[in-house]
Curated annotation (Swiss-Prot):
Required for ribosome biogenesis. Part of a complex which catalyzes pseudouridylation of rRNA. This involves the isomerization of uridine such that the ribose is subsequently attached to C5, instead of the normal N1. Pseudouridine ('psi') residues may serve to stabilize the conformation of rRNAs. This is H/ACA ribonucleoprotein complex subunit 3. It is found in: Nucleus, Nucleolus. Keywords: Nucleus, Ribonucleoprotein, Ribosome biogenesis, rRNA processing. It comes from Danio rerio. Belongs to the NOP10 family.
């Protein structure tokens, strides 16, 4: 059994152990992908994120 989630009407995550949500749509895994030090494509992902300004260092500081 793995933790799954689906989005409700308000766009909030609802966590469940079921494979389908109440409307019959499949749920998504709530676990992140495994990290591998042998990842051949990490350089490409970082390049794409840098190009589109998605890196955390390119985001404005959060207001506390």
């Amino acid at each position: 059994m793995f933790l799954q989630f689906y989005l409700n009407e308000n766009g909030e995550r609802v966590y469940t152990l079921k494979k389908v949500d109440p409307s019959g749509q499949p749920t998504s895994s709530a676990h992140p992908a495994r990290f591998s030090p042998d990842d051949k494509f990490s350089r490409h992902r970082v390049t794409i994120k840098k190009r589109f300004g998605l890196l955390l260092t390119q985001q404005p500081r959060p207001v506390l």
